[in-house]
């Protein structure tokens, strides 16, 4: 009986790991698929903004589902909440798949956006449940934390591979490129969601006791009574926009073989530009993975505040260099062109923007730690509000690509530059708790 329970836990852990990866997979699917829709509406004058709409719909779901997801977890428990998220994810990806059947027109695009929105609900629900569920299966403590670190690594790895895989399937964007060209990744997503639902359905998972102290706790105030939390909410909103906007717009930039794009170098368009763009964007996520691994070794020696100052300072320098140098100089990067690995010439701006992945890798946890420090019993409410603010990952890239359409790709990076400047301010002064007189016990 004990062996049966142990084997069940191993299967549950593996399933949760796959879901951890799927969260990043579904989230990072929107930007590379946006290359297809951007091309479909290339003559609209707002192609980049249109291409980023799928990403916007994905993150917009957090605004509506952030707090309800937490309430759902409390009401029906970890397992049923996870199953709800998995089923919702399956439906969302299925709708995106069906959008290809409607054709490359406004009707197909509308169906795709609806699918991206539903997928956003799924990702939000899974984000709410996967972390604590892995901790629960691991028995808490160091073992539970270890499982979450492994899951986070798979999450980053999935974020790295997704734009690369989609880019390789698309190759070079042409007038004939359609949603059906990325059916393989959608099939993979559907299969993983279906398998996870079946496996998890048959695994007994005991929910922890929830809600006993909450009902007895008196809340005289709210997280909004704390200035450093209010400023932290803005910081998390703009951070997610920076994290998504930098590689998403970079993918569009490299995939664009017109004179304005990074895929047009020295008078020659790049062959397989979409594949190269996806790989370059994937390298950004790879550096985020590297940054998270490295920072885990120094987190006990360097404060969140100091890491934020260093990361945002370096990030601003990288963005300024990218904007100033643009395509004036080129560098060679190892990329997969869709057929083989090669050294490919890309604008030097791409290299500096990719390096920003090292900077953004530590920001979520650092902002969360700084913004919730000293909140005590208000921390749970603060977490729900933070989950809603992930919507910044949809809205800020939309603003950035509106600027890209009207003023150029490099000019659009003024958006993440301003956002990083704000986060630098938050680390220097905004994170200080000046409301210590408010009781939090």
Regions found by a protein language model. Give the residues of each.
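Conserved MFS/SLC helix-loop-helix module at the cytosolic interface between two early adjacent transmembrane helices
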Residues: 64-109
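Intracellular juxtamembrane helix-capping segments at the cytosolic ends
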Residues: 125-139, 360-376
